[in-house]
Amino acid sequence: MLTFEHVRKNYDSKRVLEDCSISFEPGKVYALVGPNGTGKSTLMKAAAGLVKINGGTLTYKGQPIGTESKKHIAYMSTEPFYYDYMRIRDVKAFHKDFFADFDADLFDRLLTFMELTPDLKVRALSSGMAAKLKIAVTLSRRAEVIMLDEPLNGIDLIGRDQIIHTIIQATGNGATFIISSHLFDELEPIVDNVVMMKGGKVILEGELEAIRAEHGKSISDLYREIYADIAVPQF
């Protein structure tokens, strides 16, 4: 469905994706894990058509990533992507006009569940509220592939529960989900497959239970083992 074959990506002289190969299959939920700087965000941005790869092939349903694939792939970045002067109702109107698959009624329901109101200004949102808004916007697209980059960052425990519940509900529509997060323990109940990246490459990929059985340890313990040489907080 969404396939990377020996993909390379450079930012100036820095190689951020190196011989990256993986295929994401329809209807599955993938956890994309690894410390900062391992290529997770760049992989997502390339799939969303936001950055151009320098080598290899990247296709969606056999066709190169481009205008057509953007109609079917929704991507939530870690960066804010609204103007400060907007109210939430303006964000809704913008996405309704821009994306044919945007479900305005679903967006309204998600706002209610997330305890957000349409008249709130973007500049007045806390980091947690802004994160919830990004989730609501992205999940309101009826896309075939939904990519969420660190959706639990900056969220308190109650907010995380709301977001996890929302994602669980959304996974029932048959879309492929690709979710990057350091908080794997909280994503574990909804994940089908795990993808680990290091040095811009996919170094381990497979079904969650199969990886546990093969390595005889939890994903968290495996993470600590694989990334022991990288000084980052562990989940």
Model-derived segments and spans:
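Conserved ABC transporter NBD signature motif
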Residues: 55-69
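Catalytic Walker B motif of ABC-type/P-loop ATPase nucleotide-binding domains
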Residues: 146-150
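ABC-family P-loop ATPase nucleotide-binding domains
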Residues: 78-133
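Helix-to-loop junction immediately C-terminal to a conserved catalytic motif
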Residues: 48
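The feature captures the beta-strand-to-loop junction immediately N-terminal to the Walker
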Residues: 33-35
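Helical segment within the ABC ATPase nucleotide-binding domain
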Residues: 160-173
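Conserved structural motif at the start of ABC-family nucleotide-binding domains
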Residues: 2, 17-19
